[in-house]
Amino acid sequence: MNIMRTTMLLAFMTALFMGVGYLVGGGSGMVVALFIAGGLNFFSYWNSDKIVLRMYGAREVDEHSSPVYYRIVTKLAQRASLPQPKVYIINNAQPNAFATGRDPQNAAVAASTGLLKQLSAEEISGVMAHELAHIEHRDTLTMTLTATIAGAISMLGNFALLMGMGRQRNSSGNSQGAGMLGTVIALFVAPFAAMLVQMAISRTREYAADRRGAEICGNPLWLASALSKISGGGQTFYNEEAEHNPATAHMFIVNPLRGEGADSLFSTHPATENRIAALHKQAEKMAKEGNKGTKFAVENGLYRKHGNLEDEDLNPEAQNGFTHNQKKKTVRRGKDRPTWLRH
């Protein structure tokens, strides 16, 4: 159902783009618009991941420079039967993360320093599992294409304004009125409709990634707890890169822009409380079906809190990924974690 809906929305956006092209240049304008869309999507297909990672100043890490974070991603990718993605860290205090790449073989995940500092290993696992679900569903490609087409529609709308003004000087009567109507549609209606479609696709894919991510990590409550912590990040911490490039907001697990409100037509993401409620329902279902880890979490008020990854992955002096104090705390409680997450 999600695949069919996404396909229909993408087809609508392409038709909308061609329609704006027709308003600008008639039949030939529609054909040109189709070729432009194809060219932009071709470029985005091959280069969007590099552009976004460079835009946010992402730094690639490995098992030596960021051992625990990298190991979590590796283990989750194995559990999901996905190729090992490239792993990045963004130097930003706002807790957030995103995935990018044209397919599972050329994918990358990125987490902010704020997320690694503020979340526990379990919560980070939930977040990374969500991002891997996006990769598995090829949402990274879908959202890149929708963002590209939406941007192109806005660009054509501005061009239509200039064309419309020129035509009005050389026409009168009904033709002038028709030209004005076409300009209004191209400049305001089409970009607005494209924005709504882009946001609808984004919201649909977030719910699906939450469900699948919970299955990958094995405990929906890890992701629910992470979302609860991250949700206030857009208000508490300023994400300068995201504010300057709002077209990338849909990529993040939670909207990085300030002022994000209710679950509405104008939201890039579903309301966080709705996502958390859905994850709690999924946890209850998994517990009833015999998932021991989830059953323990439900019966004991979510999960047993463990230390975050600040010392392991952000302190260059940490030995083998742990400081002395962090190692003591992790070893003492490590037996409560699932085998794949024990350090």
From Swiss-Prot:
What CDD domains does this protein map onto? M48B_HtpX_like
- Give the EC number: 3.4.24.-
Chain segments carrying region Disordered: 308-343
Listed GO MF terms: metalloendopeptidase activity; zinc ion binding
Report the record's Gene Ontology biological process terms.
proteolysis
Its taxonomic placement starts with: Bacteria, Pseudomonadati, Pseudomonadota, Alphaproteobacteria, Hyphomicrobiales
Mark out the compositionally biased spans (Basic residues).
325-335
User: What stretches pass through the bilayer?
Assistant: 7-24, 29-46, 145-165, 177-197
Enzyme class, first EC level, given as a word: hydrolase
Please provide one cellular component term from the Gene Ontology annotations of this protein.
Answer: plasma membrane
Family, per entry: Belongs to the peptidase M48B family.
Regarding the membrane, this protein is recorded as: Multi-pass membrane protein
Cofactor(s) this protein cannot do without = Zn(2+)
Instruction: Copy out the cofactor comment.
Output: Binds 1 zinc ion per subunit.
Tell me the superkingdom of the source.
Bacteria
Q: Which residues form the active site?
A: E131
What Pfam family is a match for this entry?
Peptidase_M48
User: Where does it localize?
Assistant: Cell inner membrane
Q: Keywords on this record? A: Cell inner membrane, Cell membrane, Hydrolase, Membrane, Metal-binding, Metalloprotease, Protease, Transmembrane, Transmembrane helix, Zinc
UniProt-recorded name of the protein = Protease HtpX homolog
UniProt-annotated binding residues for Zn(2+) = H130, H134, E206
